[in-house]
Design a protein with these regions (language model features):
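Polysaccharide-binding and catalytic clefts of secreted carbohydrate-active enzymes
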Residues: 1-104, 116-117
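Alpha-helical scaffolding within the catalytic cores
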Residues: 63-65, 85-100, 122-136, 171-175
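Substrate-binding cleft of secreted/luminal carbohydrate-active enzymes
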Residues: 105-124, 130-203
Length: 203
């Protein structure tokens, strides 16, 4: 946590920035060996929490520490996180309690889930996934959109959705239109703008 907090402090102190945004990487695996010694020390000192809750606490404390560090230097600089769009995955696999952060003060100013799916995705269709976040997040909500998928086959979208970004050229623009009508959504991010550079067919 100290290494991360100090890195953020260096950026906020030395650069004229508007915001710090973390990507969706937290615990890299469920493997118990990666923090075996830290968890053993915790248990030996009387800790009662499961490994899963221990990890979530570590991430929560890191997020809260980063937020506090930023605000102590420049209160106008915002802090947000762009997590994976699957809330259950965030909580159970990478130990990121995104709902806690988005519902309680002192963690983030905004949340920006990576809803990198088309409307026909069989696992996480865009509209339903967006609604889930609207129903759960109470902080400022942005949505990250999948410009990089334009013109590409989506192997993990199921049979009905795998060719959606090839056949339909206006998916991202329709997503922007849809988001603009939702009171809970404050805006959107594009991943990534490099997808606009050399592809005239990009939607």
């Amino acid at each position: 946590t100290d290494l991360i907090v100090n890195g953020v402090k260096e950026i906020v102190l030395n650069y004229d920035i508007d915001s710090i945004c973390f990507d969706d990487y937290f615990y890299p695996t469920k493997d118990k060996n990666i923090d075996k010694s830290a968890y053993k020390s915790y248990k030996d000192s009387g800790g009662k929490k499961s490994l899963q809750d221990f990890r979530r606490d570590n991430i929560n404390n890191m997020v809260k520490s980063v937020y506090s560090a930023i605000k102590s230097i420049k209160s106008n600089v915002t802090f947000g996180i762009s997590p994976a769009s699957n809330i259950d995955y965030d909580y159970s696999t990478i130990y990121a309690d995104v709902i806690k952060w988005s519902r309680n003060e002192g963690y983030v100013d905004y949340i920006c889930p990576q809803i990198y799916f088309g409307f026909k995705n069989e696992n996480q269709p865009f509209m339903q996934t967006t609604k889930l976040w609207c129903d759960n997040a109470t902080c400022k909500l942005y949505v990250a959109l999948p410009m990089y998928k334009s013109g590409q086959k989506d192997e993990f979208a199921g049979e009905s959705g795998k060719n959606e970004f090839i056949k339909e050229k206006d998916i991202v623009s329709r997503q922007v239109t849809y988001l603009s009508k939702l009171e809970q959504v404050s805006g959107f991010y594009i991943f990534s703008y490099t997808s606009l550079k050399d592809n005239e067919e990009t939607s």
